[in-house]
């Protein structure tokens, strides 16, 4: 096959680790965008500064004047009222405004760009109207599934997902046939850049360009380079939207280089991004005590589903094996598993066939499994933002949840201090008598 197959970038867990502060992005099509006209939203409308934009707080999705097919799908999916980020974003986004949005995990950011792009998509055979990029295969797969749910009553719209780990020939076959060529493409930067470079994918008809978990993609030099190359292959005039739960002051100017006078939305102050229904604790212990303490927690806690984060693929494999030997219904998801097997395991977990998932940070961002109400940091992440994304897997969409972090060395203690400082919270030690299940389980 082409050179694309040989040097296809597949971002591993190690490559997804936090890097140094990035250098400014190189000039892309459209040039460097100015800040004039930027609109900022605070989660507290009363605290919004003079001149800031206060969103249209709708009582229902119908006020957004969406297509009837979309309104039917929203109702069919069981949604009644938009979240705060949806109330603020969607009315402006469907008008073609560039959007830079930070909102806490679990508040419906994905639905913002899915609904907006389905509202705007142009169905032309053999042409791609919408391009969505994210940093992991699992997240791409999940976003594709969200598109399929919301376009249930739009049968003419074709959705495609492209990522590494599967033969590129399958992607080429889909793209070459006008009957199967997707109008909306979701994918990872490495595979998409390979397809663009070898001219299998042409992006000259793209009207909307979306980055989900944008800080992660623009914070890594290799991934940012891929994003820039793909961006240059799209028309200068297009809508650009970027979303994440964490947008540092350093990464925001880089994001805005891709945009023209974006609507900037920061739901809640950036220092207060933890979820309201999420109870958070830490446990001090020795490294050798982790397995025993984990077993005790899994026995005593009343969880629906739990995700356990570790720092490497080897530890994920070994811990999963240990849990299964102890008769816990566990599955491991990390970059050391083939793509086909990863998707199978992800579906097993999401479909509630498995209640325990051991994962690396490849599963730490954007993955949405509604039944997770317990997140355990078996190994703490290296920084505060990664901590937020991890614990955000529990207690999504305002539901209750519990997060417990093991602290076994000085480095862990420093991370804990960084979390408390960054998000202005005081994380208590896990109580000797445990936690009342009513604090982290849904009550009817």
Curated annotation (Swiss-Prot):
GO terms (BP aspect): mRNA 3'-end processing; mRNA export from nucleus; mRNA splicing, via spliceosome; subtelomeric heterochromatin formation; transcription elongation by RNA polymerase II; transcription-coupled nucleotide-excision repair
Ranges of residues in domain Helicase ATP-binding: 90-265
Membrane-spanning segments: none
Keyword vocabulary terms for this entry: ATP-binding, Helicase, Hydrolase, mRNA processing, mRNA splicing, mRNA transport, Nucleotide-binding, Nucleus, RNA-binding, Spliceosome, Transport
UniProt-recorded Gene Ontology molecular function terms: ATP binding; ATP hydrolysis activity; mRNA binding; RNA helicase activity
EC number(s) stated in the UniProt entry for this protein: 3.6.4.13
Domain Helicase C-terminal: 277-438
Group of enzyme by EC: hydrolase
Main location: nucleus
Short motif Q motif, span: 59-87
Listed GO CC annotations: chromosome, telomeric region; spliceosomal complex; transcription export complex
Short sequence motif DECD box: positions: 212-215
One Pfam assignment: DEAD
Top-rank taxon: Eukaryota
Signal peptide residue numbers: none
Subcellular location: Nucleus
Binding site for ATP: 103-110
Catalyzed reactions per annotation: ATP + H2O = ADP + phosphate + H(+)
Family: Belongs to the DEAD box helicase family. DECD subfamily.
Free-text domain note: The Q motif is unique to and characteristic of the DEAD box family of RNA helicases and controls ATP binding and hydrolysis.
Role according to the record: ATP-binding RNA helicase involved in transcription elongation and required for the export of mRNA out of the nucleus. SUB2 also plays a role in pre-mRNA splicing and spliceosome assembly. May be involved in rDNA and telomeric silencing, and maintenance of genome integrity.
Name of this protein: ATP-dependent RNA helicase sub2
Organism: Sclerotinia sclerotiorum (strain ATCC 18683 / 1980 / Ss-1)
């Amino acid at each position: 096959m082409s050179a694309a197959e040989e040097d296809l970038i597949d971002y591993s867990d190690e490559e997804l680790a936090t890097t140094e502060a990035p250098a400014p992005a190189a000039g892309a099509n459209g040039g460097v965008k100015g800040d004039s006209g930027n609109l900022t939203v605070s989660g507290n409308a009363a605290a919004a500064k003079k001149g800031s934009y206060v969103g249209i707080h709708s009582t229902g999705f119908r006020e957004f004047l969406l297509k009837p097919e979309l309104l039917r799908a929203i109702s069919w999916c069981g949604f009644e009222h938009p979240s705060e980020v949806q109330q603020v974003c969607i009315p402006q986004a469907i008008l073609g405004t560039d959007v830079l949005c930070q909102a806490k995990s679990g508040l419906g950011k994905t639905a913002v760009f899915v609904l907006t792009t389905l509202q705007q998509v142009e169905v032309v055979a053999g042409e791609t109207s919408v391009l969505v990029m994210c940093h992991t295969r699992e997240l791409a797969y999940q976003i594709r599934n969200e598109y399929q749910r919301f376009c249930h009553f739009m049968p003419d719209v074709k959705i495609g997902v492209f990522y590494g780990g599967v033969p590129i020939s399958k992607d080429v076959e889909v793209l070459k046939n006008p009957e199967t060529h997707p109008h909306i493409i979701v994918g990872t930067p490495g595979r998409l850049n390979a397809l663009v470079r070898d001219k299998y994918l042409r992006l000259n008809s793209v009207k909307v360009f979306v980055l989900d978990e944008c800080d992660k993609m623009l914070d890594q030099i290799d991934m940012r380079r891929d994003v820039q190359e793909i961006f240059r292959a799209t028309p200068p005039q297009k809508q650009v939207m970027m979303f994440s739960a964490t947008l540092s002051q350093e990464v925001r100017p880089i994001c805005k280089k891709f945009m023209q006078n974006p609507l900037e939305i920061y739901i809640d102050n950036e220092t207060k991004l933890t979820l309201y229904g999420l109870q958070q604790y830490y446990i001090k212990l020795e490294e050798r005590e982790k397995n025993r303490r984990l077993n005790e927690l899994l026995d005593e806690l009343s969880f629906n589903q739990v995700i356990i984060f570790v720092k490497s693929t080897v530890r994920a494999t070994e811990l999963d094996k240990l849990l299964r030997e102890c008769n816990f219904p566990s599955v491991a998801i990390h970059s050391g598993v083939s793509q086909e097997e990863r998707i199978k395991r992800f579906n097993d977990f999401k479909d509630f066939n498995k209640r325990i998932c051991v994962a690396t940070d490849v599963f730490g961002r954007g993955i949405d499994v509604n039944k997770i109400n317990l997140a355990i940091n078996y190994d703490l992440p290296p920084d505060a933002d990664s901590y937020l994304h991890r614990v955000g897997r529990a207690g999504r969409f305002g539901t209750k949840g519990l997060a417990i972090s093991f602290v076994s060395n000085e480095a862990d203690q420093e991370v804990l201090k960084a979390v408390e400082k960054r998000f202005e919270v005081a994380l208590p030690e896990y109580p000797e008598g445990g936690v009342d299940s009513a604090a982290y389980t849904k009550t009817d």
